[in-house]
Amino acid sequence: MLLLGSMWVSTGSFPPMVVVESKSMMHEDDGSLGAIDPGDLIMVMSNDRADVVTFVEATEEGNENFGYESHGLPGDVIIYRKNGGTDTPVIHRALLEAVANGSGWDVPGTSLSNVQSVSWTLEYDCSYHGGTYKLRIEAWEPEHAGFLTSGDNNFGGCMVDQPSANSQGQGGGLVDFQGNPVQPVRDEWVVGVASSEIPWVGSIKLLTTGAAGSVTMKSWNYLALTILLVLASPIAFEYFPTLHTSPEEEE
């Protein structure tokens, strides 16, 4: 309880950590350190304490956030509720943000200012049909101010979570528990920003809830090794020699 309370104070979020269930943020098929894989525990920093840096801001030369990375790619990963609903939150990367400007839209991290629709090519690689191309947002008219988001696992072609921003050839996007298309993520729908990662440990919870199907064999192996090392460490310390200094030697 003391540890949980200290993490709550540190992050400003409760619960202060979430367990990742899906493969949507994986960078490699069998998982990798630094990326977000099924079974990882992710510390959630309150968005009141951390400003969200989008992918386009982190990849724009001259921007104050240029070069910033989180969990293996530029920009922050956010945890949000689809359309502000009560279904399981999504943990995906913030690609860009549409900010209202009079009758138009600004997109921080780009040259777009007071535009009626958003068209922009991101330096975001997508693998599709054996080739690689850049993610393109084409003539997107935001329903309201908010973030466009996407999972990092784009080996089957890039898909933006918000269907209204997906160009032809991309996936259909996400829907909420009522079947409504997910809209741009409002600030108040953001649960927090993904911070530190504890790999593999959350697999235990997924196993107990019957949701461990996405956890890779590599993660199970590393988890088993971690548990063995923790259990063996007290025994190992028993065999370490204890150094004594006699009073005569001290003189």
Name these PLM-found stretches:
Residues 139-209:
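Extended, hydrophilic extramembrane loops/domains of integral membrane proteins
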Residues 115, 207-219:
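Short, surface-exposed polybasic-and-hydrophobic patches located at secondary-structure transitions
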Residues 109, 113-119, 123, 128-129, ...:
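Long, low-complexity, polar/charged, intrinsically disordered or flexibly structured peripheral segments
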